[in-house]
Amino acid sequence: MASYVIEGGNSLKGEILVQGAKNEALQIISATLLTDQEVVVRNIPDILDVNNLIDLLRNMGVKVKRPTRDTCVFQADNVNLDYIKSEQFLEKSRALRGSVLLVGPLISRFGYAIFPKPGGDKIGRRRLDTHLVGIQALGATCDYHSDMQAYELTASRLSGTYMLLDEASVTGTANILMAAVLADGITTIYNAACEPYLQQLCKMLLSMGAHIEGVGSNLLRIEGVQSLHGCEHKMLPDMIEVGSFIGMAAMTASELLIKDVSVPDLGIIPASFRRLGIAVEQQGDDLFIPKQEHYEIETFMDGSIMTIADAPWPGLTPDLLSVFLVVATQAKGSVLIHQKMFESRLFFVDKLIDMGAQIILCDPHRATIIGLDKRVPLRAATMVSPDIRAGIALLIAAMSAEGTSIIHNVEQIDRGYQSIDTRLNAIGARISRL
């Protein structure tokens, strides 16, 4: 178990480039299974979750070349279906929640898929019903094997249909979409997720020869084709990393230029940080965060406490609420953080309370933060990172704290952030890896 030693109280200065989007990468890499031709993917983040998925594809027989750190060439022309049925495949899939995205391409192209009860973050229940119900509606048969704790799907041929999803699940929509592009007839998905990364998947599939209408809306119409061909695809910058860097700059009173962020795909993220009183200036496709010794949380027009809540796109991504929460601890004023889409994701606040933050955990979904206005800095502490998003929030807290903090289990941070210690040290942070 690796650890970070963080010397707090150091300001950052300079510019930082954002990595490729983790959540997009998991979808795009899975989609390379839909063709036997070469698919070139650029701006791939060099992070644990993505690399584990690439290794899983290699084990399945997919040819993978990596000419540069952020570019991969995939060719799934000799997929080993026997390996997919093996215990080793299930074991590796179980350790990687993103592996569920292989189901759509596998059932669509090969008529067979299997996946275990997944791993990933310990952030409460994350239902897979949307995936299974949608793919079954296309004609697949699903059986649960209690001895393997795995779901097995089979289909001779998928057929298009109309479906109304019970939730706008991003991975659920992606899985159904990847299954539908090779199905017979027309599939209509209503209440589809429409996040930028899902739009990117649609654009990639279109460039491979798929027929998709309604990209960017919650109503997708897919006309199945016989086969897809190769393509080249470049991934968006990671909006979660953009938000994390905004939070770091605010907490450490730093001047920071965040480069090439793809502003149109950030949605309400910059505006939400401005609600906390943080100055976020757009300069072309970059974001400039000026040095601020203090920032004040806004109130609603009636004077009531500001609420920051997650919601399906175009609402605020749930992956950034931990960053908003930690940033609010040093603001002037109070805010209610409402995590609607997952429970248990706020339980890391006890570590911030130990550091001196004033937080009331109302229930598994809500926390009220009373900002200290930087009059009382957070204290250094020794902590364990429970998941990716809490991990980055704890890192931000440690960077702003007085003294030297230690964060254990930083492999959780590695799952979503590329060489974060090296990149931050280059602009003034003092982080050592043990």
Curated annotation (Swiss-Prot):
InterPro entries: Enolpyruvate_Tfrase_dom, Enolpyruvate_Tfrase_sf, MurA_subfamily, RNA3'P_cycl/enolpyr_Trfase_a/b, UDP_GlcNAc_COvinyl_MurA. The active site is at D121. Keywords: Cell cycle, Cell division, Cell shape, Cell wall biogenesis/degradation, Cytoplasm, Peptidoglycan synthesis, Transferase. Gene3D superfamilies: Enolpyruvate transferase domain. CDD domains: UdpNAET. Signal peptide: none annotated. UDP-N-acetyl-alpha-D-glucosamine binds at R97, D319, M341. Pfam families: EPSP_synthase. It is found in: Cytoplasm. One of its GO terms (biological process) is peptidoglycan biosynthetic process. GO terms for cellular component: cytoplasm. Pathway: Cell wall biogenesis; peptidoglycan biosynthesis. GO terms for molecular function: UDP-N-acetylglucosamine 1-carboxyvinyltransferase activity. It is an enzyme of class 2 (transferase). It comes from the Bacteria. It catalyses: phosphoenolpyruvate + UDP-N-acetyl-alpha-D-glucosamine = UDP-N-acetyl-3-O-(1-carboxyvinyl)-alpha-D-glucosamine + phosphate. Its EC number is 2.5.1.7. Phosphoenolpyruvate binds at K22, N23. Belongs to the EPSP synthase family. MurA subfamily. Cell wall formation. Adds enolpyruvyl to UDP-N-acetylglucosamine. PANTHER family: UDP-N-ACETYLGLUCOSAMINE 1-CARBOXYVINYLTRANSFERASE. This is UDP-N-acetylglucosamine 1-carboxyvinyltransferase. The lineage of its organism: Bacteria, Pseudomonadati, Bacteroidota, Bacteroidia, Bacteroidales.
